[in-house]
Amino acid sequence: AYFMNIFVTGACGYKGTVLIPKLLKKGHKVTAFDIMWFGNNLKEHDNLSVVEGDVRKINEFDLNGFDIVIHLSSVANDPCGDLNPKLTWEVSCLATMLLAENASKSNVDQFIYASSGSVYGVKTEPKVTEDLELVPISAYNKTKMVAERVFLSYADQMQVHCIRPATVCGLSPRMRLDVSVNMLTYQGLKNGMITVFGGEQTRPNIHIKDMA
């Protein structure tokens, strides 16, 4: 088996806390980079290094020797993104450009970016595919779209993969209850009943283990 040296941004967040134990279990060496606004729920491991840092200064970090960069850093969800648009653009776009440039200069082989299915906006089509036009509405999904474009401009220098997951749900050591499925599950467990507003709308979801 080929074991890789992997650098992960946003590593202590909702998705990273599920992904990193899987990478370690497969024998890879992982450096977890996170600002740790919500602490660190990663368990200690011989192949894990945890670095507290601001992704907006990622150009100061040495990426030489890494095979893959997985970019999960983000100001998560639409309301948070709109709360401080300047911070959202800095984290999702400026930092993304600095990270891509750093990775390229450091001869990183592959780049995986966690974008969002929300870049499509609100569609009337029953099924949303990659062929449909991107019509982002909020600061969150606008910055995701721009960040994709930044990474794709480096596709001639390294392998670039942009994934657009549906709303990620499921259990994580760094739990999020702003996600509808998680919130309804919590309500059901705590109150024995759930509250559904509307009831006619549809929303795509993906389990966190299927994404990681």
Residue ranges of model-derived segments:
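N-terminal Rossmann NAD(P)H-binding glycine-rich loop of SDR-like oxidoreductase domains
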Residues: I6-K26
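Active-site segment of SDR-like NAD(P)-dependent oxidoreductases
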Residues: C12, V75-P79, G117-P126, L134, ...
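Rossmann-fold cofactor-recognition segment
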Residues: D46-K57
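NAD(P)H-binding glycine-rich loop region in Rossmannoid oxidoreductase-like domains
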Residues: V55-V91
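Conserved Rossmann-fold NAD(P)-dependent oxidoreductase catalytic core, especially the SDR/UDP-sugar
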Residues: M97-A139
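Active-site helix of classical SDR
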Residues: T143
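NAD(P)-dependent short-chain dehydrogenase/reductase
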Residues: R149-R203, I208-D210
